[in-house]
Amino acid sequence: MTVTMRQMLEAGVHFGHQTRFWNPRMAPYIFGQRNKIHIVNLEKTMGKYNEAMNYVRKLAANRGTILLVGTKRQAREIVSEEASRAGMPFVDERWLGGMLTNFKTVKQSIKRLKEMEAMVEDGSIERLSKKEALMATREMDKLKKSIGGIKDMGGLPDAMFVIDVGYHKIAITEAQKLGIPIVAVVDTNHSPEGIDYVIPGNDDSSRAIRLYARGVADAVLEGRSQALQDVVAAGSDEFVEVQEDGSDEQA
């Protein structure tokens, strides 16, 4: 789904941070200032946003996985909702150090979480003592909170989408170490350096965050849908219809 400049304006994408907190590396994306607040150039944002969404669309069409990361209060619910809608992994609580760089260990925790969920589902947790069941439930809830969003990721993601680069420095460093491309919303108080696909704009407003996350989810779904259509089209080209004329029928 395409996003218009009007929608960006209504969501407050153009409102940056206070001018005294600005990062000079964001200068190319700044239009000016109003009441000591930097105003982001939405023409630049539109171009960069579309470039980022095209990348996500192609990635999804090629069955790629994009990890959505938004752990600050106003982003959590939005990120988990939109990632779930697109069938993509997400981190909406605290980023655990080593989530990518030490994924082998994280996989062990995922295995443990799945085992415990299976115990609840098949009722075997009820065979534990009251104390053991309580401890197991607490452990499961803790694991769900920290890694529930990535339990079906399988392996390292092909890309990562981040809301607020300053808030997620560890996640970004890990992705960079592993050569995982990063799509990120960068506000006027942060540096766009090291980000593969920069979306210059407000990273605090929940309406702006919803616009970005919905855009990523839509791009994923569009990419997958297009890939499916291509498969169907390729299949129909190979299909030859055989008509029965009934000439071989016996009386």
From Swiss-Prot:
One of its GO terms (molecular function) is structural constituent of ribosome. Belongs to the universal ribosomal protein uS2 family. GO terms for cellular component: cytosolic small ribosomal subunit. It comes from Aromatoleum aromaticum (strain DSM 19018 / LMG 30748 / EbN1). This is Small ribosomal subunit protein uS2. Transmembrane segments: none annotated. InterPro entries: Ribosomal_uS2, Ribosomal_uS2_bac/mit/plastid, Ribosomal_uS2_CS, Ribosomal_uS2_flav_dom_sf. GO terms for biological process: translation. The keyword Iron does not apply. Keywords: Ribonucleoprotein, Ribosomal protein. Pfam families: Ribosomal_S2 (PF00318). The gene is rpsB. CDD domains: RPS2 (cd01425). It comes from the Bacteria. The keyword Ribosomal protein applies.
